[in-house]
Amino acid sequence: MSQRDAVRLADQASFGPTEALVTSIKAKGATAWVTEQMALKNSSYTSGKGGEIHQFTGSGDFCTGKGDDCWRDYYSTEPLLWDFYRNAVNQPDQLRQRVAFALQQIVVINNLDVSGNYGFRNYYNVLLRESLGNYRQVLKKVILSPVMGDFLNNANNDKDAPNENFARELLQLFSIGTCELNANGTLKGSACTPTYTNEAVRSYAYALTGWTYPAGGATSYGCYPTGANCRYYGGANDGDMVPVAKYHDTTVRPLLNGYTVAAGQTAPQALETVLDSVITHPNTAPFIGKQLIQHLVSSNPSPAYVGRVAAAFTSGKYLSFGTGQRGDLAATVAAVLLDAEARGDSVARSGGKLREPVQMFTGVLRGLNGATDGDALSWWWGETMREHVFRPPSVFNFYPPDYPVAGTALVGPTFGIHNANTALARLNFLTYLLDWGGTPAANSGVPSPVGTLVNLNAFVTDAADANVLVDRISMLALGNTLPTAARTEVVKAVSWWTASTDATNWKVNRVKAAAYLIYGSPHYQVQR
């Protein structure tokens, strides 16, 4: 396996190549490495507080007397963001984490409209656990999540006048999409044929009535409606919502794809019918499969590539991967990563994807032997780059999967958050790490603070020869040497630093210059 393909796979299936990871992939080969990754135990989210905020019945504000960090520690997802970046940079289950990150940008919740990090912790741990399981189970846990129920108004949804918000997004964003698709993801016909009607959304909303929060919540005002539970995201089974029969609609409800909720079905029975109707819908495999390709490999996959991935989703098998059950994510992800289009060296302008900010943060830190406690990557760099993890602006994520690239017929989802300001911010991030020294150990409120910084010592050994240094960092970041003209200019810039320009630090300054110019270049910013 070539250096280029090993680095490419590391880009697609991890949070960034390290020299050790690339060596491992080259030794094992793509299939064996993916197999090994799928067998690893998942990392998890552990930080944050419990559900006391939804059990408070006193007067005044819950945070009164609890210190300056109360809102952060109980209400916000910032503690989970610390875990996210620590795990992404350090933990071995790289593939599972990357797939879970893709899923959380498909089945979206956010910390702008809903608060309580203990509930978000449950939700994102489910995505980590199920990211290589089955998409039907992912959807089931999403439907039963009290955080999602709160976010999209399906918790305590009464049969008398059900809120249709969640039902609409279940169809539009989480499963079948809005237009009828061929198996290869292209439109059926010459224009969009809608996949559902308002009446269909209404039927799904009725079918999903009758779910309330798990027991355990309390307020000083009592719970509404009578017989339902108060807002609470904790408890057994990941905090899954529980059924309340009197609030569940038991009328016959026609669903899509030939399915019907029969008269008298309980809320759990109706849920299973809903799941069957969307997981077997012919749109779901190409709609979800294409988005996984876009998050991991390429913004503009060919229809043939989408078709092969959709076939793996439908059959539940790809090579030796999968259980044979429709929606198997291990089979689907293997098809995404091991397909010839993913493994090929595409130089076409339509190939690859703009590296999203999170990938840049983690890619540079991992490549340059860095460390982070996540603190600086939240409000500072996350907000600056418009990808503050766990805080997308809406259920439509940070960017849409069909965001158009101006002046072309291509889409570039990540360009939805890319502009002149964020382009400069990418370079400023490198300046922050390389010239400012990053951030020292964070405040004492962050557990095990290490700050956010890189360690360039391993590269200083090659700094005496600018050509060797530039090629080493290029081979790690890009999987290849820079194009000739670019390489010449980078070597020239790096060579400016000598013992005569800085007798003490010239070698480390060479490393900083090389890293800045390579990681800041279009050759790195566009993942191919």
Regions found by a protein language model. Give the residues of each.
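N-terminal mature-domain "stem" immediately C-terminal to a signal peptide or N-terminal signal-anchor/transmembrane
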Residues: M1-S44
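Short, well-ordered loop/turn elements at secondary-structure boundaries
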Residues: R4, L132-N134, K512
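Flexible, low-complexity segments enriched for small/polar residues
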Residues: V7-S14, H281-A285, G289-R326, A334-R528
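Active-site substrate-binding loop specific to GH73 endo-beta-N-acetylglucosaminidase modules
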Residues: K26, M38, G50-D68, R72-Y85, ...
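Amphipathic interfacial helices
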Residues: S76-L80, N90-R98
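Short, flexible active-site-proximal loops enriched in glycine and acidic residues
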Residues: L95-V99, N111-Y118
